[in-house]
């Protein structure tokens, strides 16, 4: 049964079921326990196994509040898929290393994008996000987001949720690629990752590239960030243990902080949505 929330956080809320106001205090308290953001407008409460409610933010963008149990199950599936795909990622790294020298413009551009996901922690991005949120990702990166400094390139843009993404790229092949593209660009507002007659690389193009390498499991650009987060976490943790082998909890926390910074995320989002809890649990056992 759908319930509609009317009002705002300043004047208070009323709840309606079939256009009849809910006045039972117990029912109202149950709704409040769902913790639906007060800033959302036109809220519809579903409270199903998948979705608790949806509403619209200040920019009239639809926002969905998912059931925590659904998210937990999806995370289990996500981490299992990642842990079962070690051969895929090994194969992918070899392919993109080769494709950075590919003469096909499209394939080479995709290889550069995937390399930057791994080395700089950037999101893939898309034109819809750019238009609606004024946020940039790799497929919507423009020359104005690059700063050439000696043998390195600084990539600087505003990404998802208004977070500034800032990272240096010191990969020689990628720097050569970006330098050459920049020299022939007609404007700093041009998209970098284009091919042919100004065709722009999209997230779908990158996912199709990944699909060619996959066997049965479909790996997407989102999975690349998850895999990268866990590999970075393990690497950072090992380095921290060399200098401090007394406090595992402290090193786990610090390693997650380092991953969050690399991925341009908050600590809580990184821990909740990117790092496999089984990896953390297994590490924590060896005190």
Report residues per predicted region.
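The DNA-contacting recognition helix of HTH DNA-binding domains
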Residues: 266-267, 277
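Catalytic-site neighborhood detector that most strongly recognizes the C-terminal catalytic loop/helix
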Residues: 273-287
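A positively charged, amphipathic N-terminal helix/segment that binds anionic biomolecules
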Residues: 1-136, 144-227, 231-252, 256-263, ...
